Every structure is written in structure tokens, then in C-alpha cells.
């Protein structure tokens, strides 16, 4: 993690697995290096790990991100959606075990946000890893979350946790707009309202 744990344990990989787990983060402000080109930003995690075949892996990632032909541009010359895709690609190129995302789509308009939510699902099919996604958008949580954790007011605590019955990891299936999607969205909205009102929620897993 970025900060040392105050209490508790976090397990990543089985006890038989060797090596330190690799974690990556996509920040809310993306934290792209403005003095590096698109290709330079993608290559940096691999250079820090002293990986081989960096140029080829960067080319492959550029194709996945639909950024081919832009590899020599700097982040300031990209559109908002292109910068978002670059940040995701830089995080995934090192093949992390866990990818943390801190509201990466919050500054985007609704249409672009939905496009990138779908794009993230496509990336996850090709780069399977555990993803922890922080959001204040209920619809985004219902669309992306296999499990959803609701945090209470400060000091933060887990107010509720459960499996999302509406979740599918198939990027070709868009559940948004279905009755089942709206049903889960309403339940989550009611849970958020209850927590804000100071009501206690029972921790569940799937209920």
C-alpha cells in the first residue's frame, strides 16, 4: 500500500506464491508525467522494474489504448479521454496483481464517462487483476462493481458490503438500462440515504 496499515492484514496471492505482489494506482488527477511523451509514460513502470522487451510491450499497449500514432505527443496535447486511457495503460502495463483507482472518471462528462467505464471492462478482460474502484457515482458502482462496499461518514467505516447481483464481467453485455440494473441502483441509493441519516445497516454478502 501507499501508507502503512494501522491494523489488520491484507492477503494478496496464495501463501505458496513467490515474490512481492505488484500494485498500481490511477489517481483522480491521473498524475501523468508532463515531461514524458505518451510512450515515455507507458515505458516508465517497465524501466523501473528493469523489464525486457519494453518497446514491444509499449507498442502493444498503444494499440489496446487506441493511441497509435500519438506515442510522441505529451499529455498536454491529448484529449481528456486519451489521457484517461493513457493513465489506465500505464497502470496495467506492469501487470499488477491489484489496481487501485481513485475516482478516475469523476471529471468527465456523462457520455465519455460511460464510454470509459465500458473500455475499462474491455481492458480487464485482457489484463485480469483485482480492481478496487473508488467512486461517488452510484450507477458507476453498480455497473463496474462485482462487490460493492459502502463507507460511512468520518471517521470512515464499512457501513455495508455485498455482492452485486447485477454484475457481469462480459464487456459485450451492457446491463445499463435494464430493470435489474435500476433495481440494484435504487437499493444502493436507499442504503446511502440511510447511512447519511445515521441509521445502522447490517453487513451482508449478497443480500
What do these predicted regions represent?
Residues 52-70, 122:
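Conserved ABC ATPase "signature" region
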Residues 113-127:
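Helical segment within the ABC ATPase nucleotide-binding domain
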Residues 26, 88:
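Hydrophobic anchor residue at the start of the ABC signature
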Residues 99-102:
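Catalytic Walker B motif of ABC-type/P-loop ATPase nucleotide-binding domains
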Residues 39, 71-74:
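Signature (C-motif/LSGGQ) region and adjacent switch/coupling loops
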Residues 39-47, 55:
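Short helical segment in ABC ATPase nucleotide-binding domains corresponding to the A-loop/adjacent helical element
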